[in-house]
């Protein structure tokens, strides 16, 4: 464990599903493994040996974090999946990363999932370097990929290397800083060292042109360097590296490297770039949180062992021997096995059993967890993803993570009584691991309904129930997570809750107004909801202040069950305008019931409508099927928003209701003889057309 945080990097490797992220990660673990076993000669262990070893110790590659070492530096790699249904995994990794490597397919350039992951990284302000992978692939084009980084991501790439050759003739890269060629010629064994050569004559002019751009970008970012550069002096390699590092850490530029991880070309320079340009925990600096019980009091923790202990749990994983592993990023302070800490999010104390760092092929017990690093804790009982762990005597709640609500649900029915019990265990374990996996009981049918981010997400969860927990169950058809909202304001609605029959009565009178509510995300304070707002406009104590939260709670209760078909209500602002109370008969419960009923009656008058999830769909198809594909999208109530060319194929972008996309994968295959593919990402909620809404409401209310 390195104590010097200047030598620590917490990074993630992020990519579209087939860009080669796993191979890149494996090669990084391989090369850093060699680096760790100093003194052992490398005996040409082939990729397959490594892969078998990977399979045997499957826990680490699938684990949330692996620690490895490179040239005296420690690199903690946090794994992120590439499939859109698992965006929550990406979201939670990015929350605890300091930097990331974005891997792009050298033929496809920036793909839809790359765009989404890039946007998520921008949300958490994570500095990135880019690796254009698969340069050996037929049709690979480095310059096209760099252009897509500009066009599709709106980012400023800083080209650090140029490829030497392409496809089968890809032999290495030109290093634009050192102005040397780094080559791996012919078939390269895993672990082979590159050869440093002169730049090939046919690339000399291009290399000079790109180096000039690079030097100019760095010089323009610093006055002293600018004077030196425009005064005709050369900038030193050290000055250039320091300038690039500063620009990268500030997310002003994104260094671009290239290679082919599968063919073992370009990985070592990528690791060098991770160390040279991505930030340390010290570069990231202090983290912000708030006081327990008062979100308005801002607290900070510096990345130092001298500060009080604070950490964020970012993933829970099951382990065959240790039960539950809780992966945490320690932001400040130091903690030892056996210590009692506070879970300030839950208001409970936890005792830490063992502490591990996950190394490339084993769990490594450590005797302390220090600021700036990533660990697995064992023995925590109540901690879930997004919880803060901290010093019991100096508590803080760190900013948590936002998890999207599920967009798709299925009912699941165990086949036997023993399956029923196993299902309970499976659901508990899986929902601990995955915050976007939800479970509810359908009161009408008595069925268990599970929710997730897409068909694949639920397939994987159901499959895990069968494999890991031996649950045999029947799975129903997918259901869409509809919502309800209102289209017009209701200025005043009066409701009196009255029950005065013997003994203590109940009395509460409220006058509320409601209106549609759709704030801009940027205007929201931390912790504020984007779908509901409550305002108290009562004056003169006509409703005592201790009853105001009860009215709010009653309104929120009523929003769980909408007017049209019982779907949750969203995007409503409710204002408590006036009311009345009784000295003896008023209570919190009376005002809660009054708030609840008032909302129900107000919604009925506010032109309620049904909302459905819209998906952003991108179909890549050969040109001859394009008409068919577009016609099919239109028949699914989709709206085509753009058409592009990409790598010899056509790209159709559209917004389509999720309810119309079930089974699309099979339809698309048969329509295009298996030659088209698509990606689908949740986009937004939109109003359901009246005729379709009428059918959904009738079916839901049993009047169809």
Curated annotation (Swiss-Prot):
InterPro entries given in the database record: EFG_II (IPR041095), EFG_III (IPR009022), EFG_III/V (IPR035647), EFG_IV (IPR047872), EFG_V (IPR035649), EFG_V-like (IPR000640), EFTu-like_2 (IPR004161), G_TR_CS (IPR031157)
Swiss-Prot/TrEMBL GO biological process terms: ribosome disassembly
Keyword Repeat attached: no
This protein's GO CC annotations: cytoplasm
Main localization (coarse): cytoplasm
Domain of life per record: Bacteria
Residues reported to bind GTP: 15-22, 79-83, 133-136
tr-type G domain residues: 6-282
GO MF annotations, alphabetized: GTP binding; GTPase activity; translation elongation factor activity
Role of this protein: Catalyzes the GTP-dependent ribosomal translocation step during translation elongation. During this step, the ribosome changes from the pre-translocational (PRE) to the post-translocational (POST) state as the newly formed A-site-bound peptidyl-tRNA and P-site-bound deacylated tRNA move to the P and E sites, respectively. Catalyzes the coordinated movement of the two tRNA molecules, the mRNA and conformational changes in the ribosome.
Family that this chain belongs to: Belongs to the TRAFAC class translation factor GTPase superfamily. Classic translation factor GTPase family. EF-G/EF-2 subfamily.
Protein name (database record): Elongation factor G
């Amino acid at each position: 464990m390195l104590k010097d945080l200047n030598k620590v990097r917490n990074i993630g490797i992020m990519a579209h599903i087939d860009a080669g992220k796993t191979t890149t990660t494996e090669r990084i673990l391989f090369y850093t493994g060699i680096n760790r076993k100093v003194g052992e000669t490398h005996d040409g262990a082939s990729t397959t040996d490594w892969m078998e070893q990977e399979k045997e110790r499957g826990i680490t590659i699938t684990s949330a974090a692996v620690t490895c070492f490179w040239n005296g530096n420690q690199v903690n790699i946090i794994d992120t999946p590439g499939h859109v249904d698992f965006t929550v995994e990406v979201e939670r990794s990015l929350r605890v990363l300091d930097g990331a490597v974005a891997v792009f397919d050298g033929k496809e350039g920036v793909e839809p999932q790359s765009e989404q992951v890039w946007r998520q990284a921008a949300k958490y302000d994570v500095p990135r370097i880019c690796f254009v992978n698969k340069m050996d692939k037929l049709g690979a084009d480095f310059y096209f990929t760099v252009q897509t980084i500009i066009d599709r991501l709106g980012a400023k790439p800083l080209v650090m290397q140029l490829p030497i050759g392409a496809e089968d003739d890809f032999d290495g890269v030109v290093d634009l800083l050192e102005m040397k060629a780094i080559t791996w010629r012919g078939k390269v064994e895993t672990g082979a060292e590159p050869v440093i050569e002169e730049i090939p004559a046919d690339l000399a002019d291009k290399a000079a042109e790109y180096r000039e751009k690079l030097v100019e970008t760095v010089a323009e970012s610093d006055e002293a360097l600018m004077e030196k550069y425009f005064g005709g002096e050369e900038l030193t390699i050290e000055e250039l590296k320091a300038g690039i590092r500063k620009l990268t850490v500030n997310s002003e530029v994104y260094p671009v490297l290239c290679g082919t991880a599968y063919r073992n070309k370009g990985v070592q320079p990528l690791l060098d770039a991770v160390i040279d340009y991505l930030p340390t925990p010290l570069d990231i600096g202090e983290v912000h949180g708030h006081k327990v019980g008062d979100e308005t009091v801002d607290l900070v923790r510096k990345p130092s062992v001298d500060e009080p202990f604070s950490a964020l749990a970012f993933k829970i994983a099951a382990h065959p021997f240790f039960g539950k592993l809780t992966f945490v990023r320690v932001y400040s302070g130091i903690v030892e096995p056996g210590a009692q800490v506070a879970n300030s999010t839950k208001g409970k104390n936890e005792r830490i059993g063992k502490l591990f760092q996950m190394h490339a092929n084993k769990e490594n017990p450590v005797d302390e967890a220090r600021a700036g690093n990533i660990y697995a804790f064992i023995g925590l009982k109540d901690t879930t993803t997004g919880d803060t762990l901290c010093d019991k005597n100096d508590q803080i709640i760190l900013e948590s993570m936002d998890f999207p609500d599920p967009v798709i649900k299925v009912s699941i029915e165990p086949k036997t009584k023993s399956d029923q019990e196993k299902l309970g265990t499976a659901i508990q374990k899986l929902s601990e691991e995955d915050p976007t996996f939800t479970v509810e009981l359908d009161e009408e049918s008595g069925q268990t309904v599970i929710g997730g981010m897409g068909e694949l997400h639920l397939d994987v969860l159901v499959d895990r129930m069968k494999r890991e927990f031996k649950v045999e169950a029947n799975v129903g058809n997918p259901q869409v997570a509809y919502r309800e909202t209102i289209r017009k304001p209701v200025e005043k609605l009066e409701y009196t809750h009255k029950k005065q029959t013997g003994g203590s009565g109940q009395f509460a009178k409220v006058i509320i107004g409601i209106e549609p509510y759709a704030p801009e995300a940027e205007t929201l304070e931390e912790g504020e909801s984007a779908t509901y707002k409550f305002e108290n406009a009562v004056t003169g104590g006509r409703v005592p202040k201790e009853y105001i939260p009860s009215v709010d709670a009653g309104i929120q209760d009523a929003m769980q069950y909408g007017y049209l078909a019982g779907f949750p209500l969203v995007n409503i602002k409710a204002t408590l305008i006036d009311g009345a109370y009784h000295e003896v008969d008023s209570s919190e419960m009376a005002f809660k019931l009054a708030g609840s009923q008032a909302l129900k009656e107000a919604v009925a008058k506010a032109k309620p409508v049904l909302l459905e999830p819209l998906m952003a769909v991108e179909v890549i198809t050969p040109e001859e099927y394009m008409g068919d594909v577009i016609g099919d999208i239109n028949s699914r109530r989709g709206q085509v928003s753009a058409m592009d060319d990409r790598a010899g194929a056509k790209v159709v972008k559209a917004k389509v209701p999720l309810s119309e996309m079930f089974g699309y994968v099979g339809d698309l295959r048969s329509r295009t003889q298996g030659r088209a593919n698509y990606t689908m990402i949740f986009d937004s909620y939109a109003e359901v057309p009246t005729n379709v809404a009428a059918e959904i409401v009738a079916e839901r209310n049993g009047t169809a």
